């Protein structure tokens, strides 16, 4: 399986393979760290414990730090507890954190590492499909606040990312489906081959022994190319937020009870409809969004009667400038543009179209 190079001021590799613990330990040794903390989630304690024992056997002072599962772990309170623990363990600027888990764990681990002593090394070991193709690659870290998702954070690149596809065996099907939304996103913005694979055999796209490893690699290749050119989202990197403006508003309204990928799927349909209203894309391309997403069981509609709440959520999006709502939109496959300042009427019309299938 491939190794993907992320080229930046601090280049690093994304390793995609099976049984990668030995390589993780070797990388930790070569980092110069004496102390290593694995930040993980309760369901993964056994697997994290196996890695911790291997680190200890290699002569590293290793620790496991369990944080609350999912988005409930991405808070300032939880980050504070992590920093307190690092202090008790005597972590210095030369030490290392390993983020081991889903996207919430890797986001939190990266943020904790970015802030401790103004930045210590971090290795990311994503264990969910969503984290593999989205959260763990690119150096974005963050926590949530009452005002929105990931509004507090830092850009802090890992020294390595290890994607062990064996972790996919333990994931429920609905988690594989939700994570696939981020892969499909990269297909629309940069890699038509991804879309073709889903259209040809959607079932195989959900299988570790089918197309899924290739899709993971293709999606990461898209993201790594973008991140290599624009680490801090000053321009090009914004294209990775396709579907996220409305998606994040849905997550906020649902109090983060929706899976991120499901919200992004609906967000892609929303912005496709908005682009269609603006005359940027055809009815056929909007329908292609729906068909591909629905082919693997992702949602493409949203309940009505909540426009004002969602509108407020979109107003808090990080891409906005001067109080203007800005969307990443398409003119065609792999042809991405900014859609700025839509009217309330246009937004409401796009929102209303999300209910057409439900009526």
From Swiss-Prot:
GO BP: amino acid biosynthetic process; aromatic amino acid family biosynthetic process; chorismate biosynthetic process
Cofactor: Co(2+); Zn(2+); NAD(+)
GO terms for cellular component: cytoplasm
Amino-acid positions noted as binding Zn(2+) in the UniProt annotation, renumbered to this chain: 182, 244, 260
Chain positions recorded as NAD(+) binding sites: 69-74, 103-107, 127-128, 140, 149
InterPro entries, per the entry: Dehydroquinate_synthase, DHQ_synth_AroB, DHQ_synth_fam, DHQS/DOIS_N, DHQS_C
Cofactor binding: number and manner: Binds 1 divalent metal cation per subunit. Can use either Co(2+) or Zn(2+).
GO MF term set: 3-dehydroquinate synthase activity; metal ion binding; nucleotide binding
Catalytic activity: 7-phospho-2-dehydro-3-deoxy-D-arabino-heptonate = 3-dehydroquinate + phosphate
Broad EC category: lyase
Pathway linked to the protein: Metabolic intermediate biosynthesis; chorismate biosynthesis; chorismate from D-erythrose 4-phosphate and phosphoenolpyruvate: step 2/7
Enzyme nomenclature, EC number: 4.2.3.4
Subcellular location: Cytoplasm
Domain of life: Bacteria
Keywords: Amino-acid biosynthesis, Aromatic amino acid biosynthesis, Cobalt, Cytoplasm, Lyase, Metal-binding, NAD, Nucleotide-binding, Zinc
Its biological purpose: Catalyzes the conversion of 3-deoxy-D-arabino-heptulosonate 7-phosphate (DAHP) to dehydroquinate (DHQ).
Family assignment from sequence similarity: Belongs to the sugar phosphate cyclases superfamily. Dehydroquinate synthase family.
The protein's name in its UniProt record: 3-dehydroquinate synthase
Organism per entry: Corynebacterium diphtheriae (strain ATCC 700971 / NCTC 13129 / Biotype gravis)
Lineage of the organism: Bacteria, Bacillati, Actinomycetota, Actinomycetes, Mycobacteriales
């Amino acid at each position: 399986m491939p190794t993907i190079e992320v080229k930046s001021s601090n280049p690093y590799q994304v390793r995609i393979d099976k049984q990668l613990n030995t390589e993780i330990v070797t990388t930790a040794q070569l980092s110069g760290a004496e102390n290593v903390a694995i930040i993980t989630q309760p369901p993964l304690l056994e697997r994290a414990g196996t890695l911790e024992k291997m680190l200890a056997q290699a002569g590293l002072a290793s620790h496991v730090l369990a944080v609350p599962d999912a988005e409930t772990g991405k808070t300032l309170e939880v980050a504070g507890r992590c920093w307190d623990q690092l202090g008790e363990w005597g972590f210095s600027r030369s030490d290392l954190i390993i983020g081991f888990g889903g996207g919430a764990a890797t986001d939190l681990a990266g943020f904790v590492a970015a802030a401790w002593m103004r930045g210590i090394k971090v290795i990311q070991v994503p264990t969910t499909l969503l984290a593999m193709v989205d959260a763990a690659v690119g150096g974005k870290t963050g926590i949530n606040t009452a005002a929105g998702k990931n509004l507090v954070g830092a850009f802090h690149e890992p020294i390595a990312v290890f994607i062990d596809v064996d972790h996919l065996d333990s994931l429920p099907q609905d988690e594989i489906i939700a994570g696939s939304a981020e892969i499909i996103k990269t297909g629309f913005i940069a890699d038509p081959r991804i879309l073709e694979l889903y259209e040809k055999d959607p079932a195989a796209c959900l299988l570790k022994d089918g197309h899924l490893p290739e899709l993971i690699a293709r999606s990461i290749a898209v993201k790594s190319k973008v991140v290599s050119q624009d680490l801090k989202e000053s321009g090009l990197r914004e294209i990775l937020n396709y579907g996220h403006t409305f998606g994040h508003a849905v997550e906020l309204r649902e109090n983060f009870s929706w899976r991120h990928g499901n919200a992004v799927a609906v967000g892609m349909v929303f912005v496709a409809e908005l682009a269609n209203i603006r005359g940027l894309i055809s009815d056929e391309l909007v329908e292609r969004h729906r068909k591909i997403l629905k082919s693997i069981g992702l949602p493409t509609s949203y309940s009505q009667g909540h426009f004002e709440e969602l509108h407020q959520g979109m107003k808090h999006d990080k891409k906005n400038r001067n109080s203007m709502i800005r969307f990443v939109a398409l003119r065609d496959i792999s042809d991405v543009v900014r859609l700025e300042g839509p009217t309330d009427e246009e937004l409401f019309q796009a929102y209303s179209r999300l209910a057409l299938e439900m009526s």
